Amino acid sequence: MLTNQSHNDRIAQAVRLHRESIIGFLRELIAQTQHGEAAVQNAIAVASAKMGCKVERVKYDPQTVPMVQEFAAEQAITQGLRECVVAKTGTAGAGRSLLFFGHPDSEPLSRLAEWKHDPFKGEISQQRIYGWGVADDLAGVAIYTQAMAVLKACGLQPKGEVTLVSTPSKRHARGVSALLHQGLTADAAIYLHPAESGMGMKEIKAFASGQLEFRIRVQGAAPPTSEPLQTAFAHLAVNPVAKAFEVFQALQKLDEQRGKEIFHPLLDQAVGRSTNIMVSMINCDVADSLSRVRHECWLGGAISFAPPEPMDQVMGQVQNALAELAKGDSWFSANPPQLHWDSGVTGAQVNADHPLYQTLAAAIHRTTGHTPRVNPMHTSSDIRNPMVQKNIPTVGLGPLCGALSQNGQTDEWVDVEDYLAAVTVVASTILDWCGAEPANG
């Protein structure tokens, strides 16, 4: 009977032995990125089949996925059919089941000429592997794929069912949610994605705040003149910029109120506050003349809110704050600010004493010597999806990374040794959670 430490040592030895092929698979995914998402998915499907997994490719339409406590404006949702790769191994009902998911889609290719390293060759320099999408999220998909390959090399397999899914995620692609609403389930789930925080596996994602994104249209009125330059008549106009500032002040007041009333210990310990309303944009219609009153002004921003606060409650508070502006203001009474919600997701959390968290944390400690902590600052993390949609406890982890393209940077990278350690951690976690038995054949 293998102990957790002994099977971890056996797995770590296999990772060292197969180091080049484990890195090579990630380099293959990087190379396929230039050919598009379908090429990446095909490489994942082929590799999963070679490991003896039962592979299924599932097409779906993101716009028809029924979402629980989540929404997005139609124009924000990715268009057209997408495809998930689903690979299964182990035996359903023979032990606890585990779902791994990551996303194969990356940011649209851009600014490639600014890269110092070839974005599609997986170049390695100073223990970093570089490539387009390597940290978002090719490494995540590669980790759980190679973890299964390592178990096979060890002559081991999970007793319980393990499901590996490569699911589109960006721009509300909703891949994992599509599968969950089609019947995919598990006792627990782990989201594999390099840590954007820069902490690598010193942390576990077990907490995700919810987030709402909004825009508010504020109308104005030009002064009663046909003169092209309106500055001298400004006192006779309704300046939408000034009225937008009143809206901004109302949002600030609500933000201050919520900051006093809403408390979550993890967020408060990390940043001293548990919720925020951030106005990040103000924009008027075409400013072809600075001497004319604008017709309208738009404000936009986002709201973070801690679980378990309901999303509808937060939305209602914003609506009430805007409605209050009409009291005693004849302009807003006749022309109320128009609130548009662009998107919203609900937060979720797994406590640090949950068996899933404890299992993963123990595997990380055995492999790296570090005791991980919870990262509560990754707002709207994909760990929320199995929890909110189907009440499946979910955590996330990933290796050290940096210079992500989604942050406007170049030469995206993942730490090679941390990537290899993550493969060890995931393979060990599979056996700890699902149980181990000799591989067939």
Q: Across the structure, where does each feature detected by a protein language model lie?
A:
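Short helix-capping segments at alpha-helix termini
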Residues: M51, C154-P158, L325-F332
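Metal-dependent amide/peptide-bond hydrolase catalytic core
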Residues: M1-R10, M199, E213-G441
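Fold-level recognition of mixed alpha/beta catalytic cores in primary-metabolism enzymes, strongest
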Residues: I129, V134, L138-D255, V293, ...
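Residue-level signal for inorganic ion chemistry
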Residues: L29, T33, H193, A244, ...
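Hydrophobic/aromatic beta-strand patches that form the interior of the parallel beta-sheet core
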Residues: E56, L98-F100, A188-I190, M278-S280, ...
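Acidic/His- and Gly-rich active-site-bordering loop/insert found
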Residues: L2-I129, P158
